[in-house]
Amino acid sequence: MKTVQIEIPKGFKVESFDEVNGLLKFAPLPKDIKERVKTLDDAISALGASDKDVVDYRVMQSLGLQDHVLGNQELVIITKALNEGWVPDWGNGEWDKWFNWFYGGSSSSGRFSFLSSDNLRSTSTCGSRLCFKSKDLAEYAANQFFDTYKKTFTI
């Protein structure tokens, strides 16, 4: 038996090996969602044009709705894309749910903190569509999409 060592290219994994013809296929390693979603357009691409929230957003755009209304739908799309299919289970107090909450003396302030729920009690000051599955994603969204939050939640 002959052994051949093949170096797997960085950023790839072995997808398949055909023993008949010796063909080795590589596939790119999936990138972290934070690397894939950096803009609203990235979030829309991640969900796909036929996603109901994306379709609703396009309709809302065509109606010429105010920026803060469109901004809310943009946050729904961004949150949904970053959560990668995770939907909060409000009946499960074991799961933490993260929501961005901004504090400030004026509408231009940029301080924020993060809230979660636990199994002893639940505090909810947000709609479930804007909850994240991790603190890391909530912090990322708050920083990366701060302008979208600002236009949605301030006058």
Q: Language-model segments: what does each one mean?
A:
Residues 1-34:
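Short, low-complexity, charged amphipathic interaction modules
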Residues 20, 40-43, 145, 149:
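Generic structural signal of hydrophobic/aromatic residues within well-ordered alpha-helices
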Residues 36-90:
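Negatively charged, low-complexity tracts enriched in Asp/Glu with abundant Ser/Thr
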Residues 75-83, 98-104, 132:
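Aromatic/pi-system hotspot detector in well-structured domains
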Residues 91-127:
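Short aromatic-glycine-(Arg/Gly/Cys) micro-motifs in beta-strand/loop hairpins
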Residues 116-155:
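Short, compact, well-ordered microdomains
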